[in-house]
């Protein structure tokens, strides 16, 4: 596995890190972070947060192959790169997960998935996920420009904000786009925050100005 990881690190640094991503993408991009993500929604009256379930595992080898083809690689090289960056379920490193229920849930979600997919912890997975989400992000930004809300994505966390509630996209509209791109929403993590709530985006309070929540300060 160490040799494979070295190869994946080379792919990340020499191929994936050179791909330009839209400004709404705030995770796994040099110079972007949770602070920058939170600042996009600072002081907004309404914030809608949704989460993509099994983010990395939802991306199969065929999508990875297409991504490398779009970068200009011929079929054989794209197939070789895609296979290096994905794994089948029997290769999945379950020891990365400590919680037995979490392991069982992941297995139940993935046991039917016959094709290799992106694996959490692989150096190439974050960059490839961002690249493969490019069309989805652009569709969300198109809606944002049309309806007057702000959109950002930090890995599997998608955030929408506006000063008027009716400017926010309907969850059904978000779901339709997400599902046509091959993903699914985690219904348990859909959350609408409004002025007066503790508005937390990627772990930071964003109501008046971005700051660390008080309870985290106490822990520190």
Protein language model features and the residues they cover:
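Polyanion/phosphate-binding surface patch
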Residues: 1
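Active-site and adjacent loop segments of nucleotide-processing enzymes
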Residues: 200-220
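Alpha-helix initiation and N-capping motif
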Residues: 4, 8, 21, 31, ...
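Conserved polymerase palm-domain catalytic core
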Residues: 42-154, 159-194, 215
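A residue-level signal for conserved active-site and pocket-lining positions in enzyme catalytic cores
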Residues: 11, 125, 203
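Active-site-proximal segment of RNA-dependent polymerases
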Residues: 4-56
């Amino acid at each position: 596995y160490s040799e494979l990881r070295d190869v994946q690190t080379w792919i990340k640094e020499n191929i994936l890190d050179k791909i330009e991503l839209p400004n709404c993408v705030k995770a796994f991009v040099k110079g972007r972070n949770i602070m920058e993500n939170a600042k996009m929604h600072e002081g907004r009256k309404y914030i809608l947060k949704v989460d993509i379930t099994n983010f990395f595992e939802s991306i199969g080898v065929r999508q990875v192959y297409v991504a490398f083809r779009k970068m200009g690689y011929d079929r054989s090289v794209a197939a070789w790169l895609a296979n290096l960056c994905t794994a089948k379920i029997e290769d999945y490193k379950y020891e990365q997960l400590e919680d037995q229920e979490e392991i069982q849930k992941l297995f139940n979600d993935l046991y039917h998935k016959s094709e290799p997919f992106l694996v959490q912890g692989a150096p190439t997975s974050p960059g490839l996920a961002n690249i493969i989400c490019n069309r989805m992000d652009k569709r969300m930004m198109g809606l944002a420009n049309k309806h007057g809300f702000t959109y950002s994505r930090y890995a599997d966390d998608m955030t929408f904000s506006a000063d008027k509630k009716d400017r926010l996209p309907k969850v059904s509209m978000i779901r339709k786009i997400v599902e046509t791109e091959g993903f699914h929403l985690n219904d348990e993590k859909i959350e609408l925050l409004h002025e007066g709530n503790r508005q937390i985006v990627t772990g930071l309070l964003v109501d008046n100005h971005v700051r660390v929540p008080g309870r985290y300060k106490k822990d520190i």
